[in-house]
Amino acid sequence: MEKVITILSEQFQNDNPGVTVTYNPTGSSSGITAASEGSADLGLASRDLKDDDPEGLTATTIAIDGIAIIVNPENDLSDISLDDIAKVYTDQINNWSDLGGTDGDIVCIGREAGSGTRDGFESITDTKDSCVLDQELTSTGDVIQTVANNPNAIGYASMADLNDTVKTLTVDGVAPSEETVLDGTYKIQRNFNVITNDSKTLSPAAQAFFDYITSADAADLISQAGAVPVATSEQ
């Protein structure tokens, strides 16, 4: 979500001189807590609200993001099934040869507890509380860098943050893209949400920013950031 909110913040500040948007990328759970406690005007979360989140909050979806399955460019695998992803991350499959690749122990890279990316990944792969990770990292950038540096690694990362240092696998023959995320054929996806506190009135500047990022005016920038804008898709 960092790439999306950064590009939107920069444009909003350019259009509104004197207004500063501060973003702290500390994870979805922290964003939800900040909105609940009032330490932030808006919380940002790359997951939906859960029953055990604080009450009195509203999540407004601004974009949909595909969670890509990534490997090192040297890996000769090109496709993996959703079922096999779950087996890899629960240590039922632990060698690349079991997937048709070159012999070698699979190194599973994932995000920390509280990460919206991890929550979305585990929810869709049905691996919540059962993942066996070799490394648990605190940012998508760290996941990408680690996979890029380890020929036997596999990881998951926001489609919006992908770069050419890693190789993206198709999942059941479908590549993550704006089209496949929007039509639902790419299954590993989650919402980018803005969290507001129902008991608090936003400042004029915060309200203006909220109105902007939830409008169709932000759609092109959201697409440029690699996510799928909801305002456009629902028109």
Regions found by a protein language model. Name each.
Residues M1-A40, A45-Q235:
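Exported/periplasmic ABC-transporter solute-binding proteins
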